[in-house]
């Protein structure tokens, strides 16, 4: 039985989809004015794993992740760069997709863009106006009247009086209450804008997600996710808008990924510890980064550091090492080993417990140990266990590559040696061993070790990996 921790109830709840066998998920995507950073990577990988697991359980998943392609930040960046909004957003959408592919993130079912849903956004604002939840200010903006929504604050567990008193909200004479937020922004000269009943303008950020999610998934859908910083005000405002407009419960399960820190500090440009995905991928293999993100429970805070990434590399290499000499034979394996079923059950129990990837990864390590033991005793059993391990790891998006690509790198030099030179040294060492010249064999092993190349001897022959 799958249980999901809902941020709304603040407890684990049995997952009951609205429609049997089908799941609708909406995740707030990127505002495309810059490259994706590590926090984005966590959300991307987290909900990729959740979607993979739901599909593995047999659900037909409609996974919607939006793109915000009109926003103050986008307009300001385009102006500063001297380029069109279309050119800016197209460039960073392409970059986002490149980052996703590198991290092994599968494409969502649909990826709606705000600019493609202006009609739906205007229609939702009009419904809010008609019901008395929104008002047209004298400056041309349209605001949501927070005081009209009795349940405002139910997601973030804040009371409206506390929000008014505690929030650092700029005084705006156009607002009836400081907590009110904009639904439609009147256009400034030269800005990107659309015609509306309230004049030329563009949508506010919050209404974009309400309109797109309900358009794609219906007035009520199963799961809404995002980063921890979106719970308030963005998701709180989404609830207020959507439930006021439709009269229906908006979302059944609210899921929020944990925060990402860097060397135990909040990631920020001002602290100089802000990393884009591509900057991190310049230092570490993509699967190592994915393993790092997947090996912690999605709700827990994680701390990025070089030490943590090296530990992730070591852990992933241990898993790959266990199947390395078996990899070429896994395609023909039929899983008859009863122990595979036991591990599969443990893996599913972990994932059914609010997608506990940390415990699921621990199951993979137990399987790796069993594979290593079986390799010495029963190769058929080892192959069956290895195949089962790789199949389970696919849910996490791990262990799907040829082990050599991680262990040796993508054709890069190691310690100044090319792959061809390393292979030549291994051939020389094999010849020395055949001639029982063990001193020469040890000399070559030590030389390669100094260069950062470790040799592994097995009955299949000698393989190598980066130190």
Swiss-Prot record:
Record's catalysed reaction(s): tRNA(Cys) + L-cysteine + ATP = L-cysteinyl-tRNA(Cys) + AMP + diphosphate
MF annotations from Gene Ontology: ATP binding; cysteine-tRNA ligase activity; zinc ion binding
Motif 'HIGH' region, chain ranges: 30-40
SMART domains named among the record's database cross-references: DALR_2 (SM00840)
GO cellular component: cytosol
CDD domains: Anticodon_Ia_Cys, CysRS_core
Motif ('KMSKS' region): 266-270
Domain of life: Bacteria
Annotated transmembrane regions: none
HAMAP family: Cys_tRNA_synth
Protein name: Cysteine--tRNA ligase
Organism: Hahella chejuensis (strain KCTC 2396)
Gene coding for it: cysS
